[in-house]
Amino acid sequence: LEHLTLSMGAMLAGVPFSAISPAYSLISQDFGKLKHIFEVLTPGMVYASDGQVFSKAIQTCATSDIEIITNTGIVGQQSCTSFQSLLDTPVTNVQEFYQTLDEHQIAKFLFTSGSTKLPKAVPTTHLMLCVNQQMLLQTFPEFEQTPPVLLDWLSWHHTFGGSHNVGIALYLSL
């Protein structure tokens, strides 16, 4: 839920985000795909649920000016911001940021699997996310009468899990 909270906050603030496959951090030994993604995105913030688990990947790929957010654990000697401290921050200017959102702004970047080479960034706008959900509702009008029960194991870094299924839950207020 922390990832979803950060994602929704980023979209509301008009800051594009990207969910990255954990395999690029936890299975890869050279972090080649993750390094490539860092070069493409130049992130200002990185979130890892457990800093210690993702420490090697973060230390290898993230520059010292990138803010690291964790639920637990530390990343080497690097200073990390706790996720809880973000929740404890007083809310300001939300309406102001909301008013500046444009449907054509990039909401998030999805990445291809990289099975043919390096992962490629796929920009996804706010409009694309909304239109996709409206298309689903028109394709499956019964969703409005009887909302589906989602048993979801799909990763949020994948378009099906992160856009389709999360979108259904948000769009139908599940």
Q: What would you call each of these model-derived segments?
A:
Residues 69-71, 75-111, 117-118, 142-150:
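Conserved pre-ATP/AMP-binding loop-to-beta segment of ANL
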Residues 130-149, 156-174:
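Conserved AMP-binding/adenylation subdomain of ANL enzymes
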Residues 7-19, 36, 40, 158, ...:
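Short hydrophobic alpha-helices that are characteristic scaffold elements of the AMP-binding
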Residues 18, 56-71:
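Internal alpha/beta domain cores that form substrate/cofactor-binding pockets in large enzymes
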Residues 1-28, 148-155:
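Conserved AMP-binding/adenylate-forming
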Residues 24-60, 88-91, 132-151:
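Conserved ATP-dependent adenylate/AMP-binding module captured primarily in the ANL superfamily
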Residues 15, 43, 63-67, 174:
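A short helix->loop->beta-strand "cap" motif at the edges of active sites that frequently abuts
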